[in-house]
Regions:
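Conserved MFS/SLC helix-loop-helix module at the cytosolic interface between two early adjacent transmembrane helices
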Residues: 65-103
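Extracytoplasmic gate region of multi-pass secondary transporters
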Residues: 34-35, 229-284, 344-345, 349
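Extracellular/periplasmic helix-loop-helix junction of adjacent transmembrane segments
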Residues: 35-66
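Helix-breaking motifs and short loop linkers at transmembrane-helix boundaries and internal kinks
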Residues: 46, 77, 98-104, 115, ...
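Helix-loop-helix hairpin linking two adjacent transmembrane segments in secondary transporters
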Residues: 143-196
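Cytoplasmic helix-loop-helix junction between adjacent transmembrane helices
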Residues: 108-147
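Central cavity-lining transmembrane alpha-helices of secondary-active solute carriers
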Residues: 57-71, 273-286
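C-terminal ends and interior cores of transmembrane alpha-helices
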Residues: 87-100, 310-325
Length: 431
């Protein structure tokens, strides 16, 4: 850091997670720009819906390399690794403004997806590094608000840029915001043991709240070892089943509103952001439910599982999106889907920091994220290949059912930790 006087900040960890949340906001704003601009881009360049599914598929292929991002973050360290990825996604996003065909978009979306795949493991590594165990659920929720806020801001901001200038300017504008955040990150972030603004009391509080069984082992994380663990698949498979909801809200709902509901660009700007407002609330609702149950004696793991189950139950409302006549009812059901998805998603994501060592968290988050993005990829390709024949309704039905299966897997694959009981001590005095 420059030789300046930095004041001590109380609760510095919340400033840090706020900084990471801001990065996530910009991350999801840039990735959502394509979905919002899609009706205009497809019309301007003559791109078909099937070709658009390949463009979104390229993004998912890139982001499926998230385990590489996680490994880089665990190896290089959070500050350096996240800075490299932030610079890469910002430049890739701005380059979208130069694309002239679907192939060019596909290449750039793949690069963007790879770089932006760093956000989730970086967020989870921040949570694991900076927060005691009892605060991680809420901290993870705060970080994941960034995904919802970024996606929420995309419709009005991108439509404004398109109508004021053109769709190319929209990509340049959102990408440039990432470079601004990068400067803030490099200036302000340091690890807890090196940050000049951290008080000794907070440093001790963070250290005291770490579980000893999750302490760093000192060796690089082993991907093979992680993949062999049942608890990893208890996180990864629910991600595979849940993440298609987010991909649909981000990349396909604007087209659905345009092609099926007859919305114009201004109407998309008015309504397409609402599911992400609801998702913001879900980011906080899931950890709140888990915390409420913990306060009443439910174990940490079981509290998380019940929060996921509640979210999965609410997701069944998505079944009716395509079956209601009123566009307002459809938007309301999409909002319920956004709320329910983030209720369960943020909870599942946070479990990586509950179940694995701190030096494994980013790698685990990256591997689980790869599974989630594989689910989004396959689901997007199915939509692109079949929507012209069967419409959107069957896909909304599938989204309403998949998370129920994910909740069952979570309960089946992840076992609650049983604390060892102390040896009984006789109450009868020795003679």
């Amino acid at each position: 850091l420059p030789k300046l006087s930095f004041p001590k900040l109380r609760a510095l960890r919340w400033w840090i997670i706020g900084l990471v949340m801001l990065g996530a906001i910009i991350n999801y704003l840039t990735r959502s720009t394509m979905g919002v601009a899609a009706p205009t881009v497809l019309k301007d360049l003559g791109i078909t819906v099937t070709e658009y599914s390949w463009i979104t598929g390229a993004f998912q292929l890139g982001i499926m390399l998230q385990p590489v991002c996680g490994y880089v973050l665990d190896t290089l360290g959070l500050r350096t690794g996240f800075a490299v990825f932030a610079a890469a996604w910002s430049l890739a996003a701005m380059a979208h403004g130069l694309a002239s065909n679907w192939q060019g978009f596909a290449v750039l979306r793949g690069l963007l997806g790879f770089a932006e795949g760093s956000a989730q493991p970086a967020g989870m590594k921040t949570v694991a590094t900076w927060f005691p165990a009892k605060e991680r659920g809420f901290a993870g929720g705060v970080f994941n608000i960034g995904a919802s806020v970024g996606s929420m801001l995309a419709p009005p901001l991108v439509v404004w840029a398109v109508l004021t200038w053109n769709w190319r300017a929209a990509f340049v504008m959102t990408g440039a915001l990432g470079l601004v955040w990068l400067a803030l990150w490099l200036f302000f972030y340091r690890s807890p043991d090196q940050h000049p603004s951290m008080t000794q009391a907070e440093r001790e509080r963070i250290a005291a709240g770490q579980e000893t069984h999750l302490a760093e082992a000192g060796a690089k994380p082993s991907v093979i070892s992680i993949l062999k663990q049942r608890k990893f698949w208890g996180i990864a498979l629910p991600r595979f089943l849940a993440d298609p909801t987010w991909g649909t809200l981000s990349f396909w709902v604007p087209l659905y509103l345009s092609q099926t509901r007859g919305f114009d660009l201004k109407q998309i700007a008015m309504f397409a952001w609402l599911p992400f407002v609801a998702a913001d609330l879900g980011c906080l609702f899931g950890p709140t439910v888990a915390g409420f149950l913990q306060a009443r004696g439910v174990s940490l793991i079981n509290a998380r599982r019940w929060a996921v189950t509640l979210g999965a139950a609410m997701m069944t409302g998505m079944i009716f999106v395509g079956r209601v006549e009123s566009p307002y009812a459809a938007i309301a059901l999409l909002c319920l889907g956004g709320f329910a998805h983030q209720t369960l998603s943020v909870t599942v994501i946070t479990m990586a920091s509950d179940l694995f060592r701190r030096d494994e968290v980013a790698t685990v988050a990256g591997l689980a994220g790869m599974m989630g993005n594989l689910g989004v990829l396959l689901f997007s390709l199915l939509i692109g290949g079949l929507v012209a024949t069967i419409g959107y309704d069957p896909f909304f039905v599938a989204l309403g059912v998949l998370d129920i299966l994910g909740a069952i897997i979570l309960w089946t694959f992840i076992r609650d930790r049983i604390e060892p009981k102390a040896e009984p001590v006789s109450q009868i005095p020795n003679p």
